[in-house]
Amino acid sequence: MCNRFYISLILINTLLFNQPLLAQQGDYLSGEVGIGLGAAHYFGDLNTATQLNRPKPAATLFFRKYLGRYIAARAGFSFAQLGYSDIYNTQNEVQYRRNLSFNTNVWEVTAQGDFHFFKFLPQERGFNFTPYITLGAGLFSYDPYAYLNNERYYFRELPVGTEGQNSPLYPDRKMYGTTALSIPFGGGFKYSIGGGRLNLSFEVLHRFTNTDYLDDVSTTYVDPNAFPKPPGGISVAQLLSDRSGDIGAPIGLPGRQRGNGSKQKDQFVTAMVMISFNLMSYKCPSGD
């Protein structure tokens, strides 16, 4: 009886006092789930100088799966507001007189690969910080709009687009869609906090896209006869196509360049502060 009692005490002592050590020895980082908040900025036909003077809000949700100490796969779902106006192009007289503007909401899903420069072990001092780079592919939705007389108009909902889309005078110009592809590329750094359970990160992610119509501006001005004529007035599409007359003499002559002619697709960038919760595993990782 006494032997059983002593054996029980030894087992209890082993479990109580050695369990944290065993857990730490077996713990390793298997993944992260987190959120991020920050700012987004657009680059394209209305912002050819790549100015960073009109940031708008952005947010993200993500899951990261570690494939080793240095490599991880990430899935993300992000939102960004984008917009710009020619009134900010004070150093370029032609663009300033063009007087175009746009806004759009972007919803994006991405798959990315992350590479850490340092071994990242959140619970070990000296290994709880690393810079990283990331590259991936994404799909996003967008639907640009502008305001006219304090009313919002979505460009795609107009019977004829601002560059003659859907007009029989320009049969080669089809209305653009609401989805496009992106290639996100960027980097950041992260630091483990909260005893190794949380990570605080800062990341800059630039997107190259395959559309030149984030801003509804790409090719040339069109013949005013391409736009339907409402009784006693000018159509909304025609007014939004050439807004130079709002601030001076109209410059939108048919055939004159309105955008950059698709020489370079539109782009956007996000900068975010992110916090994530570490998902731990007790199975030994495949490698260091």
Where are these predicted regions, by residue range?
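Residues on the lipid-exposed face of transmembrane beta-strands in outer-membrane beta-barrel proteins
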Residues: 35-39, 61-65, 111-117, 135-139, ...
